[in-house]
Amino acid sequence: MDSNRDSPLPSFIAGSYAARLGVALSFAILVIIAAGVLTSVQASATLEEDVADDITALSETQAVQLDDWLTTSRRNVRSTSRLPVFTDGTDTEKQQRLEELRSNEELPPGVVAVHYFDTETSEIRASSNQDFIGVNAAEQGAPFATDPPQFDGPDDTHVTEPFSVSVVDHPIVAVVSPVPGDEDRALVYMIDLREKADQISSHREGSFTTVVNTDGEFVSHPNHSMIGSTAPISQMESDPLGTLEPGQRMFHETDSMLMGLTRLESHDWVVMVHSDREAAYALSDQINSDLIGLILLAVVNLGLIGVTIGGNTIASLRRLSVKAEAMADGELDVDLDTSREDEFGTLYAAFDNMRANLRTQISEAETAKQEAEAAKEQAQAAREDVESERNEMEALTGHLELKAQQYSDALDAAANGDLTARVKTDSMNDAMAEVGEDINTTLDALEDTIADMKAFATNVIQSSDRVNSNAERVDRASKQVSKSINEIFEGTTEQNEGLESAAAEMQNLSATAQQVASSAQQVADTSQSAAKVGEDGREAAQEAIAEMSAIEAETGETVEEINALDDELDEIGEIVGVITSIVEQTNMLALNASIEAAHADGDGEGFAVVADEIKGLAEETKEAAADIEGRIEAIQEQAGDTVETMESTSTRITEGVSTVEETVDALETIVEYTEEVDTGIQEIDRATEEQARTAQDVMGTIDDLTTISQQTATEADTVAGAAQDQSASIEEVSDSATELRQRADDLESLLDRFTVENSAGTGTDSTAAVGDD
């Protein structure tokens, strides 16, 4: 019952296992319901997000497809309008080409007609459909005629909004492209929107797709009669059509409809995918129904568990509780047999074992009680023995107090200076007897020590007198040594200053030698560079001679080739002369043909024509021959000038070779002189370097002497300081000896208050010991 006081549960629950089980089952049911509700909410939210993403992605996919379709149509109409037949052909050729486009299926899907359109008169001049030829498009209400588009250039195109005309019974979208080179002509693709509307609306079961423009009018709708009408979404207060950017997509929902919207990149159209809200979220309702069924099933199962297992468990616990209370009241013969093999069977067995253990413990407790009574009797006897021993201890304590007083008196006498006092060591207690012997031994040792100290004090007084006398003699000698060392230090200092002055002079001499060596080295380097430059110049001159010789040879070959060309031109001139002669003969033949034609009257018309042709060709040939002859003469004249120039160049090259050869000879002479100068400068450089090294060696020797002199001065200064320190130390020793004698006198007067035996003999021994030390 005490454990229930700390339980957070009310007492009526904490005191009943059935109540606890009921509370636990109720809590489990609440947890299951809460988990089911949370799962349902999360599943519904996830499903709604998936549905929104799915519808929006579908609208984006269809927008991309529609974009591609429009781009293809624009590109196709633009390329068709550039065909030569539409820029340069006749109306008949254009009509024939348009019919071929349709019959050969060269048009994009959905194009029902192609028109060659006059933008000024709004007349269709040619068409792939014979019914449209000569039709005034403006009278039919076609927007590309009533409101003609303004093109930025020949590559521009225009897509109209859906429209209907009386000639056809379905909505049309026109794609218009200007004809290059003709501002008043355009090519128009007429596209049937029904097929495209059916294509984009057949992608998903349970949904349909529409296309609206930014004005809110349907461009495409599964119900073709709705094309051109106003879309309901544009009439809402929060119209999303005007807020969409090209390529942007969004999700919109109403009470009954879900919509995914995507605006096209290439045109102001918006693709809208519609899906019924109830059908789209049907899966969410199914999930919620399934979760409710699972929750009810779990609740029923928990109830069955509580009724079956819980009821049986409670009955078993109550029976076991009654038997446990009987055992607690001392009734250990209760029946603990059970046929259960589960945890309750184990618990019955545990209670049976506990009952056996209780019986054993009761038997052991009775045995322990008997043993305690026997121990009590033994304790009484022990107490009597202790009383007898206490009397004996009191007698021993009195004896010990007496001996302690005797020992104390002897120690007090020793403390007062009487070291001859001793104690009696016989005692009832062995330890006290040993203490007495130790006291006597200590007093003997202390008496001997005091005697030795008296003798030692006398010896110290005598030794202090001798030390004082010797210290005075050593002090006089130290002062003399210090004076001599100071004189040595002054001489060494003067010698060091002289060596430093010599070292400075040698330093200047060494620097001058090094500067001369450096200058000589620079001159040597310059001389070597000059020699190398001269050698390079000589090699370059040799190469120049070789190149100029090669140029001279090539010039000779060029002159020979030009002369050969001149000979070839002479031969060509002879051929031109032959051609000129042939032309003159041809002119004669043409003249004869003309005469024959004149004699032949009407029958000679053919001869006259041939004669005129031959004459014309002859004149042209003669002019060409004269031109060739003039060009040959010009080339021959230019070749002659070139030959003269090449010969003059060859002469100059020969003279240049001679000049370069003279330059080579001069460079060789310069190189020889430079090498001789370089040799002399190298010798000067080596001598200067040797002089610099000698100066450095002398400098090193002087530095060594300076160092030795400085060390000597330093050592002399150190020795002088040591002598002064020694003198001071001697004075301190003398003072210490005086102080030591005073303290020895004080010690001797202090030791006189102690009374000892045979002090003379001990003092002699101590004196001898001190003398040995």
Curated annotation (Swiss-Prot):
Enumerate the transmembrane spans. Answer: 21-41, 291-311
Region spans: Disordered? 717-740
GO BP, sorted A to Z: chemotaxis; signal transduction
Q: What induces it?
A: Expressed constitutively throughout the growth phases, both in presence and absence of white light.
The entry lists its GO molecular-function terms as: transmembrane signaling receptor activity
Q: Where is the HAMP domain?
A: 311-363, 398-451
Location in the cell: Membrane
Q: Which UniProt keywords apply?
A: Coiled coil, Membrane, Repeat, Transducer, Transmembrane, Transmembrane helix
What are the GO cellular component annotations? Answer: membrane
Superkingdom, according to UniProt? Archaea
Q: Which stretches make up the Methyl-accepting transducer domain? A: 470-706
The protein's matches in InterPro entries, at most eight in alphabetical order, are given as: Chemotax_Me-accpt_rcpt, HAMP_dom, MCPsignal_dom
Q: Which stretches does UniProt call biased (Polar residues)?
A: 724-737
Q: Could you tell me the membrane topology recorded for this protein?
A: Multi-pass membrane protein
The parts of the chain that form a coiled coil are 727-760
Q: Which family does it belong to?
A: Belongs to the methyl-accepting chemotaxis (MCP) protein family.
Q: Please explain the role this protein plays, according to its UniProt record.
A: Transduces signals from the phototaxis receptor sensory rhodopsin II (Sop2).
| Name of protein | Sensory rhodopsin II transducer
Q: What is the lineage of its organism?
A: Archaea, Methanobacteriati, Methanobacteriota, Stenosarchaea group, Halobacteria
Gene name, Swiss-Prot/TrEMBL: htr2
